[in-house]
Regions:
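Membrane-interface "cap" regions at the ends of multi-pass membrane proteins
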Residues: 1-31, 35-36, 40-43, 53-61, ...
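Helix-loop-helix junctions that connect adjacent transmembrane segments
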Residues: 3-6, 43, 120-127, 159-286, ...
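Loop-to-transmembrane helix boundary motifs in multi-pass membrane proteins
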Residues: 5, 9-10, 129-133, 225-227, ...
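Transmembrane alpha-helical segments of multi-pass small-molecule transport proteins
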Residues: 12, 47-48, 116-148, 165-169, ...
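Hydrophobic transmembrane alpha-helices that form the core helical bundles
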Residues: 34-35, 45, 54-144, 149, ...
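TM-loop-TM module centered on a large, flexible mid-protein loop between adjacent transmembrane helices
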Residues: 75-78, 83, 115-120, 190, ...
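Membrane-interface loop-to-helix entry segments
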Residues: 113, 127-180, 234-238, 363-368, ...
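C-terminal membrane-solvent junction of multi-pass transporters and transport-like membrane proteins
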Residues: 324-325, 370-459
Length: 475
């Protein structure tokens, strides 16, 4: 594309969305869901998630179309609607969520390789960390070659990893047994699951994790060949991934019972297929997961760097994060991101951090950026901004924005106090970069309202720090 160097077409944007969302989560979905919910609650939970996440997808589509001048997605929307500190917090939270997720992906990737090579163990052995480090820096230098080139490789890996998922769904359809599916719909035989409402709430963080990446196209809005493709890519990607997730989860519950699924090791999809067709099924899914994780890692390294770069371009992050190399890659943002991943990979050697604990924390960090995006879409509709002579569209977007905002608040509630406090602990140190950016502009760090918000973050962070010290909070 010599006439538009480095620009991303619709297919590449859809692949970024699908590639970001289909990472490791879907391959562990049968066990992750069965651990907290039975059939009835799973169906209710997916219904809530489908409506909530679809409204979020529409939010990102609407904002991409109505505010095409805002680059950087979740960061830009929070800043435009609610000020500099909220914009910074969205960028900071999204960035931490993304690289924490990458650490989790590396752990899961080498845990899966441990199926073939026992030296990698559960993904946190010395050999696994060395292997993960080599792969991390290989991806790093690949991305340095250019966004377009990396996006093309992501397109290839996205296509490659969808094939084993399609095979799983086709085989599972024929292996599905209605009597297994309906054996204990509400989980009454397993009191540990709690009430149906408890089951639904407990599965929410997992459903959010498997959908993180829905905003991927909006993050790259400035690099899209057509701005209108950003919204299309978001909705196409969402519907594709939703179908896969629901089919994988629901069909598994008709092959093995909830207690059986809950006891499986991850990637549990491999064990489900092995139950149906034998050993080759587990090998197929394991290979699919490895390809999937490699693609997801690439997507998330791109997203990490881009969100910091977008915020720095707008003077909300410090100037040094604006630097691009000759291939138009935000080089300093990329280095900062991958150094943090490397540090936490080493930490996994000395801590009890597992894939799931990393994923829950990463999920909790992204809830605030989602909340502000939904709130901004609702704010535009309430004010009527960009809706001149479009009353019907304004009413529609009022409803969509309202549902998306309620859903975002529900997710924070479902995540629980523990992850709210741990999020505050990770949000608080970001003020150092925010203050540096403000100092470079010669402006005061906070407005009066922002001082109050930051004070609340600090209180939450102090409670979390004490909780970790005292032992009533754990990572």
């Amino acid at each position: 594309m010599s006439e538009s160097p480095g620009k991303l077409r619709l297919g590449a944007l859809v692949a970024l969305v699908v590639g970001s969302m289909i990472g490791g989560g879907i391959f562990s979905l049968p066990q992750n869901m069965a651990a907290s919910a039975d059939v009835g609650a799973v169906l209710i939970g997916w219904a809530i998630t489908a409506v909530g996440m679809l409204t979020l997808a529409f939010v990102f589509q609407t904002l991409a179309n109505r505010k095409p001048d805002l680059d950087g997605g979740v960061y830009a929307y929070a800043k435009a609607g609610f000020g500099d500190y909220m914009g910074f917090s969205s960028a900071w939270g999204y960035w931490i969520s993304a690289w924490l997720g990458n650490v989790g992906y590396f752990v899961l990737l080498f845990s899966t390789l441990g199926y073939f090579f026992p030296i990698f163990g559960e993904g946190n052995t010395v050999a696994a960390v060395i292997g993960a480090s080599v792969l991390l820096w290989a991806v790093h230098f690949l991305v340095l070659r250019g966004i377009k080139e990396a996006a093309f490789i992501n397109l290839v890996t996205t296509v490659a990893k969808v094939v084993p998922l399609l095979l799983f769904v086709l085989i599972a359809v024929f292996a599905f047994k209605l009597d297994i599916f309906t054996a204990d719909i509400w989980g009454l035989k397993n009191p540990d699951l709690g009430s149906v409402m408890d089951q639904v709430r407990n599965m929410m963080l997992v459903t959010v994790w498997v959908f993180i990446g829905i905003e991927g196209a909006s993050i790259f809005s400035a690099r899209a060949e057509k701005r209108s493709d950003v919204g299309k890519a978001t909705v196409i990607g969402f519907i594709t991934v939703l179908l896969f997730l629901v089919l994988v989860n629901v069909l598994s519950l008709g092959i093995m019972t909830q207690p059986e699924l809950a006891k499986l090791q991850n990637p549990s999809m491999a064990a489900v297929l092995e139950h149906v067709v034998g050993h080759w099924g587990a090998v197929l899914i394991s290979v699919g997961l490895i390809i999937s994780l490699l693609g997801a890692l690439l997507s998330w390294v791109l997203l990490c760097a881009e969100i910091m770069f977008a915020a720095a371009k707008d003077h909300t992050m410090p100037e040094f994060l604006r630097k691009e190399n000759a291939n138009h890659v935000p080089v300093n943002a990329l280095w900062l991101t991958n150094v943090m991943v490397q540090v936490f990979l080493i930490i996994t050697l000395f801590s009890a951090s597992t894939y799931l604990s990393l994923i829950y924390l990463a999920t909790s960090m992204i809830l605030v950026p989602y909340l502000w995006s939904a709130a901004y879409a609702l704010l535009l509709a309430v004010r009527g901004e960009t809706y001149e002579n479009a009353l019907a569209e304004r009413k529609k977007d009022l409803i969509i924005g309202g549902i998306a905002l309620v859903y975002a608040v529900w997710l924070i509630y479902a995540g629980g106090l523990k992850y709210l406090l741990l999020s505050a602990l990770l949000y608080a140190p970001g003020v150092i970069l925010f203050a540096k950016a403000k100092h470079e502009l010669g402006k005061p760090v906070f407005t009066n309202v922002e001082k109050l918000i930051f004070a609340m973050v600090v209180v939450g962070a102090l409670v979390a720090a004490y909780g970790l010290y005292d032992g009533f909070l754990t990572l």
